[in-house]
């Protein structure tokens, strides 16, 4: 359960309990109606938020061959709120976030996050990809494990990362908030640092599976 106040145009929104998924969606929409977005405020709301697990059920789709991305709210083009559903031992490729701010909250299971330094040929400030990519392995910056309720924040200025469900017996579910939303990202080979573009697609939208 989360309690929040938010100042909008010098008017204080009354204290409200955020204890349902619908409350969370409304709260996030209020925040994104403002000109300036406070990432610390978003982190606190997501960190404090808990709801009944049954509220996630319509967005949960598992696939034995790959994790699934399931859209909950597209925020009028300003953000994407979605669930990732991970079967046993599934993970992402190492990837960037196309300049977006990315929050991840673990709903169920365990997720291992490995953050890597940017390849030597890449300059984040200039978004400069070198044509001559040197085949050097990526450098690990940090490794951590998320437990239910944990919230992490990621941005390209921090590095690139990989998420993985390390369990061979349990599934995992994560809630993601990305802003601004994006339709593709760069994926990287760990052993060579080489990269290529990957489209970002959804397995389901608003609880309905998309025909593949």
Swiss-Prot record:
There is a cross-link at residues 102-178 (3'-(S-cysteinyl)-tyrosine (Cys-Tyr)). GO terms for molecular function: cysteine dioxygenase activity; ferrous iron binding. Its EC number is 1.13.11.20. The thioether cross-link between Cys-102 and Tyr-178 plays a structural role through stabilizing the Fe(2+) ion, and prevents the production of highly damaging free hydroxyl radicals by holding the oxygen radical via hydroxyl hydrogen. It catalyses: L-cysteine + O2 = 3-sulfino-L-alanine + H(+). Binds 1 Fe cation per subunit. The lineage of its organism: Eukaryota, Metazoa, Spiralia, Lophotrochozoa, Platyhelminthes. Pathway: Organosulfur biosynthesis; taurine biosynthesis; hypotaurine from L-cysteine: step 1/2. GO terms for biological process: L-cysteine catabolic process; taurine biosynthetic process. Belongs to the cysteine dioxygenase family. This is Cysteine dioxygenase. Keywords: Dioxygenase, Iron, Metal-binding, Oxidoreductase, Thioether bond. InterPro entries: CDO_1, RmlC-like_jellyroll, RmlC_Cupin_sf. Its cofactor is Fe cation. SUPFAM superfamilies: RmlC-like cupins. It is an enzyme of class 1 (oxidoreductase). Fe cation binds at residues 95, 97, 161.
């Amino acid at each position: 359960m989360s309690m929040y106040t938010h100042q909008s145009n010098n008017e204080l929104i009354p204290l409200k309990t955020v204890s349902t998924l619908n409350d969370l969606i409304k709260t996030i929409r209020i925040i994104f109606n403002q000109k300036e977005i406070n990432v610390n405020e978003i982190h606190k709301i997501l960190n404090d938020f808990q709801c009944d697990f049954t509220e996630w059920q319509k967005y949960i789709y598992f696939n034995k061959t790959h994790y699934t991305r399931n859209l909950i709210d597209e925020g009028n083009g300003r953000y994407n709120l979605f669930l990732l559903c991970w079967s046993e031992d599934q993970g992402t490729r190492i990837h960037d976030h196309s300049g977006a701010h990315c929050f991840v909250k673990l709903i169920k299971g365990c997720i291992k996050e490995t953050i890597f330094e940017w390849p030597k040929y890449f300059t984040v400030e200039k978004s400069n990809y070198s044509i001559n990519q040197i085949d050097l392995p990526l450098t690990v910056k940090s490794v951590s494990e998320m437990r239910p309720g944990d919230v992490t924040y990621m941005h390209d200025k921090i590095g690139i990362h990989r998420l993985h469900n390390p369990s061979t017996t349990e599934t995992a579910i994560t809630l993601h908030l990305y802003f601004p939303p994006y339709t593709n990202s760069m994926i990287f080979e760990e052993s060579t640092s080489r990269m290529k573009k990957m489209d970002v697609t959804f397995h389901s939208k608003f609880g309905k599976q998309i025909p593949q």
